[in-house]
């Protein structure tokens, strides 16, 4: 039995290495230490101790191959900048050969007949300045256009000149802004084709509005309007019309009828009397008596006394104690609740 146990330990390293080769993970250098084990057997009177220390290193074959492959690919990218060449070379390394050449799929150029030359137009205008400079710039770089650009430019339309506008005798002169604009353009050598005054219609000859009728019953201006007019006059601003013309007269309404004094009206309550006294201390006198607006007290008949019921039950305990408490303070109830 001891021999079987002793032969087990040399196979530990081989078993771990075999498991690692079948797996895809990497293992860093490890140290395995087996503690001493005392074994006793009835067949052997003495005990024996076994200890083992094994060092092993498992290289990461997958990472090493990946590092070599990435290094080769990076050098390949640097050597072949063309994407197409790198793709063909990559396929060739894996034993893949394209069935056809890529040039076979490019159709030939169509054999179209040359277009007929355009007819030169005698009325065609010359090339503009921008086109001439473009043609000159292309010629400096050795580029010759296949056709003349002037062939594609239609001739200028032969429209009749517009009729001259009729000068309006009533037309007003140009405003100050337009005159300054014309002067500014003339300083830069720009002359307008027409006068701007031709397009400005004359001022309408509207009749002056009739003056407003002065109202004899109109009241004078209020204090705010008078101060506003005085403020404008201090700054040299005179209104075109009098503001009093637009203020309607005060309505002539009849005075309200005085209220009828009610003989049965009750006097003012305490709160109203104190309010009137407070206003009088500050010199404020109400225009009317507040008692005029207080209606008289209603003259309702006195309620009928309740009928005493002989069969009425006695007062409850709470009511009896309340009546006793009032009697102790000198309060005597005239009727029984």
From Swiss-Prot:
InterPro entries linked: T3SS_EspF (IPR006891), TccP2/EspF(U)-like_sf (IPR044889)
Region span, Disordered: 291-312
Cysteine disulfide links: none
Keyword flag Signal: no
Localization per Swiss-Prot or TrEMBL: Secreted; Host cytoplasm
Sequence repeat start-end pairs: 96-142, 143-189, 190-236, 237-283, 284-330
GO CC terms in record: extracellular region; host cell cytoplasm
Comp. bias regions, Pro residues: 295-306
Residue span of region 5 X 48 AA approximate tandem repeats: 96-330
Keywords assigned by UniProt, alphabetized: Host cytoplasm, Repeat, Secreted, Virulence
Domain of life: Bacteria
Free-text function comment from the UniProt entry: Required for efficient pedestal formation in host epithelial cells during infection. Acts as an intermediate between Tir (via host BAIAP2) and host WASL/N-WASP. Directly binds and activates WASL/N-WASP, which stimulates actin polymerization and leads to the formation of actin pedestals at the sites of bacterial adhesion.
Entry similarity comment: Belongs to the EspF(U)/TccP family.
Subunit structure: Interacts with host BAIAP2 and host WASL/N-WASP. Can also interact with host proteins BAIAP2L1 and WAS/WASP. Identified in a complex with host proteins BAIAP2L1 and WASL.
Entry remark concerning the domains of this protein: The N-terminal 21 amino acids are necessary and sufficient for translocation into the host cell. The C-terminal region, composed of several highly conserved proline-rich repeats, interacts with the SH3 domain of BAIAP2 and BAIAP2L1, and the GTPase binding domain (GBD) of WASL/N-WASP and WAS/WASP. The N-terminal translocation signal and two proline-rich repeats are sufficient for triggering actin polymerization, but each additional repeat gives higher activity.
Protein name: Secreted effector protein EspF(U)
